[in-house]
Amino acid sequence: MNTKLTKIISGLFVATAAFQTASAGNITDIKVSSLPNKQKIVKVSFDKEIVNPTGFVTSSPARIALDFEQTGISMDQQVLEYADPLLSKISAAQNSSRARLVLNLNKPGQYNTEVRGNKVWIFINESDDTVSAPARPAVKAAPAAPAKQQAAAPSTKSAVSVSKPFTPAKQQAAAPFTESVVSVSAPFSPAKQQAAASAKQQTAAPAKQQAATPAKQTNIDFRKDGKNAGIIELAALGFAGQPDISQQHDHIIVTLKNHTLPTTLQRSLDVADFKTPVQKVTLKRLNNDTQLIITTAGNWELVNKSAAPGYFTFQVLPKKQNLESGGVNNAPKTFTGRKISLDFQDVEIRTILQILAKESGMNIVASDSVNGKMTLSLKDVPWDQALDLVMQARNLDMRQQGNIVNIAPRDELLAKDKAFLQAEKDIADLGALYSQNFQLKYKNVEEFRSILRLDNADTTGNRNTLVSGRGSVLIDPATNTLIVTDTRSVIEKFRKLIDELDVPAQQVMIEARIVEAADGFSRDLGVKFGATGKKKLKNDTSAFGWGVNSGFGGDDKWGAETKINLPITAAANSISLVRAISSGALNLELSASESLSKTKTLANPRVLTQNRKEAKIESGYEIPFTVTSIANGGSSTNTELKKAVLGLTVTPNITPDGQIIMTVKINKDSPAQCASGNQTILCISTKNLNTQAMVENGGTLIVGGIYEEDNGNTLTKVPLLGDIPVIGNLFKTRGKKTDRRELLIFITPRIMGTAGNSLRY
């Protein structure tokens, strides 16, 4: 009985210890104090005991990042700024699994940590420039406490520095982290923790050896600031240019031209838990370029800046729908001026405008109609917001040209604007007309007829907005030329429009491989390459009852594993995808299977087509049919040809992020014998499939499920003896043959015009 009770109590202690280990603490307070020798102490308080954090140090920019596993943040202010020669700012952020503290430094530094009960002390000092200096502990050791106190409040020390090499003595006191970037969106795996632990035991290499092999890598990091903005930091070592930034709906696409990203560095960070406008950050390779795709939600604005060559920061700020307005439509405004305080009573408005002009450095010109007095009491308000409040209170408005601001009553400015627009209209109606010929290089001139709506320009009086009332546009299909006659400003608009639209269309090389495989080959192929699939775009399976059950699933890893979904029930799942990294291995597998007589390649056509243009491939023959027609009491017989082909029609659509959406139509026609009354006539058996799927550039779409069966019965007998009843069965041999083969179609699209996608034969 005592033994069982002891086991139960021991189990409770173990469960309690495990619960305490897994339970999360919260960061409740951060305080900073100074020590001699230019050291700083950052004291991080928790509502319960916490384990020693893990972290890393960067020297450009100078920064220390600490991660607290299974920890939350319970502070009103998560960004703390300091006017200190060493420490400039502390930022706190969290996700579902951990919290991160980022210490921004003004110069490269190193740190030690101590865990004292429910506090973590972080000792920060500058990196030691003297390599051969004698060893000294970075932080003085705390006096020895009694055994009970040590058990109640354990103290663990660690030191990290990557900006300067260690001497042998320093190696005993501090061990450097070798991991350069730790993402705040993905928790540490046990493998990473073991790698970090082993890195602590390694010694630092000499400075010359580190400089001889620079780590030219591309990394991303995400954090949240005090304004609930998402900050994405992109480090692209070796990239000296400026990135191309574009916006596609809720995506911000940053492209580094001619900067190749290794496949192992492609990653995707899910940062939706941080409650910022940024939902997801993806770093991927697109041909010879590197793309950073920022997925957003809600209203936001982007602020980007470059800290140093190869280092870029993108801040996605949330836009708040507030009552700040400068007009009737209540459009939100953002005020960025220097904060000022004003306290006036019964002061002339012109005097207030004069004070705001001095505070802002702007040249403010007030109309003679601006007069009156007002009482104003503002504290720590941006000067541009104070100016906006004054104008709203007195029904004023402003027009800015460069560094000069003209302020007048709103009605007066509207009257001036109306007069100015009327003058421009009069000039357009009375100005000289010019003629300009635009010969298009890539687009068909007939396409511009629909773009410019030239056919609907005169019947109802609703002319095209680009052409003025006196202008005209002529089209010459023979020379592919637009002849525009209008004012100089309209012709310039045409020039800009044509420069944007008359560009070469992207082309796609579509390679199809039609393979006849033995029954069970598709199942073996799926087992070899692994199965995946969660999404689909669109499919029309009325002909076969086929289903589309594969696509790019939720796996964001870009490893070397292949992605093919050819399950055992091929009739229910007959359309699958192969990623671009695995297309070469798939071709080798098909070649090997053909050498073993498991497959037979019927056709391997290639066709080059433009983006969103249909490409058609057919292979087969035409069957003659006799058609009898009766007219005017007589009959005539004609022979018509009907196609019995294996046809493939593909229309590619290139997406902005380099994927390809393919609309595929497949028809398999073959001659067959059909019964018509007591006769057997020749007919055509047809099978059709229409589907739409998204494939990455260089990936492969696999379509299967078309089966052909060849059934036959054979009878071999001995002459005469085999015809004897009953006994004749001893002299007969019956055979039954069933041959079932599957038709597989492999479609591989490649975007042409980029390196690595040249024609291959």
UniProtKB/Swiss-Prot annotation:
Keywords: Cell outer membrane, Competence, Membrane, Protein transport, Signal, Transport
Annotated GO CC locations: cell outer membrane
Residues of the signal peptide: 1-24
Any Pfam family hit: STN
Region of interest called Disordered, as start-end residue ranges on this chain: 135-157, 193-221
Composition skew (Low complexity), residue ranges: 135-154, 193-218
Topology of the protein relative to the lipid bilayer: Peripheral membrane protein
Domain of life: Bacteria
InterPro entries registered for this protein in UniProt: AMIN_dom, GspD/PilQ, NolW-like, NolW-like_sf, Pilus_4_PilQ, Secretin/TonB_short_N, T2SS/T3SS_dom, T2SS_GspD_CS
GO BP of this protein: establishment of competence for transformation; protein secretion
Subcellular compartments: Cell outer membrane
Family: Belongs to the bacterial secretin family. PilQ subfamily.
Function statement: Required for type IV pilus biogenesis and competence. Could function as a pore for exit of the pilus but also as a channel for entry of heme and antimicrobial agents and uptake of transforming DNA.
PANTHER family: DNA UTILIZATION PROTEIN HOFQ, PROTEIN TRANSPORT PROTEIN HOFQ
Subunit structure: Homododecamer. Tetramer of trimer.
Name listed for the protein in its UniProt record: Type IV pilus biogenesis and competence protein PilQ
Organism: Neisseria meningitidis serogroup A / serotype 4A (strain DSM 15465 / Z2491)
Lineage: Bacteria, Pseudomonadati, Pseudomonadota, Betaproteobacteria, Neisseriales
